[in-house]
């Protein structure tokens, strides 16, 4: 299954589907599975699409492992907007229309501290390593695609065992910043868009040598009875207006 950038997708799908012709589609309900880190963007874009199209969206946000379980279990859904890891699973991949997936957004990793706390140095691999080792506690979501990369980073820095004792795991990305803001953990480590919240401040992004962007891509379920509406929503996510929202939420469109 190939992947397309948003620019290519917009050209191929045709923005006309999102404008006046979209209102010609019979109003329906779309069941969407989405990565938890897309919650900010989709919670704003979803209502915009509903008003423009008349369709009703039901969005279920979850971690990558759980999304794979839902997709492979045969549970009904119309489309996904999820980390590319979902589409690397052979059983999950088989449930999508055999067309190129469409990249919607991407985002890198960073570190946050409680507002007013000293900001540690995370500008180099050695500095990040020292900061993590010196922190009394850290928090992130281990059971997720992003969490898997955080764990990989610990391994690259040679601090996996040291991090186990001080990690306070969360089950959803939206729990990370509040935990730091309330003093339940000293550092939050995750995708930078979900680390933007009241009560916390960025210490900085991962150093370039360790940085990696997680890509969120979209695809229509092969057995969806609402494929046209699902395609219209994906096309909507590639528009300049949607890109502006995605960017405002701390992600990079496409």
Where are these regions (language model features)?
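N-terminal secretory signal peptides that target proteins for export/translocation
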Residues: 1-4
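Exported/periplasmic ABC-transporter solute-binding proteins
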Residues: 25-75, 81-93, 97-98, 102-107, ...
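Bacterial N-terminal signal peptides
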Residues: 9-21
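Sequence-pattern detector for short linear motifs
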Residues: 6-9, 34
């Amino acid at each position: 299954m190939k992947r397309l950038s948003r620019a290519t997708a917009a050209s191929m799908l045709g923005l006309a589907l999102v404008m006046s012709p979209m209102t010609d589609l019979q109003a329906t309900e779309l069941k969407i599975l989405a990565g938890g880190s897309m919650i900010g963007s989709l919670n704003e874009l979803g209502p915009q699409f509903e008003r423009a199209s008349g369709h009703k969206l039901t969005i279920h946000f979850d971690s990558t492992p759980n999304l794979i379980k839902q997709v492979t279990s045969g549970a009904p859904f119309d489309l996904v907007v999820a980390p590319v890891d979902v589409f690397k699973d052979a059983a999950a991949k088989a449930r999508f229309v055999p067309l190129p997936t469409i990249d919607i957004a991407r985002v890198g990793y960073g570190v946050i501290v409680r507002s007013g706390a000293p900001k540690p140095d995370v500008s180099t691999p050695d500095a990040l390593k020292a900061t993590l080792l010196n922190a009394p506690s850290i928090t992130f979501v281990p059971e997720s695609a992003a969490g898997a990369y955080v764990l990989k980073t610990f391994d690259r820095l040679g601090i996996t065992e040291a991090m186990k004792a001080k990690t306070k795991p969360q089950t959803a990305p939206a729990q990370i910043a509040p935990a730091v803001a309330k003093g339940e953990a000293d550092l939050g480590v995750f995708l930078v868009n979900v680390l933007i919240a009241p009560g916390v401040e960025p210490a900085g992004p991962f150093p370039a040598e360790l940085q990696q962007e997680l890509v969120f891509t979209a695809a229509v379920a092969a057995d969806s009875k609402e494929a046209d509406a699902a395609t219209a929503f994906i096309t909507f996510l590639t528009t300049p207006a949607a890109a502006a929202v995605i960017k405002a939420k701390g992600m990079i469109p496409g």
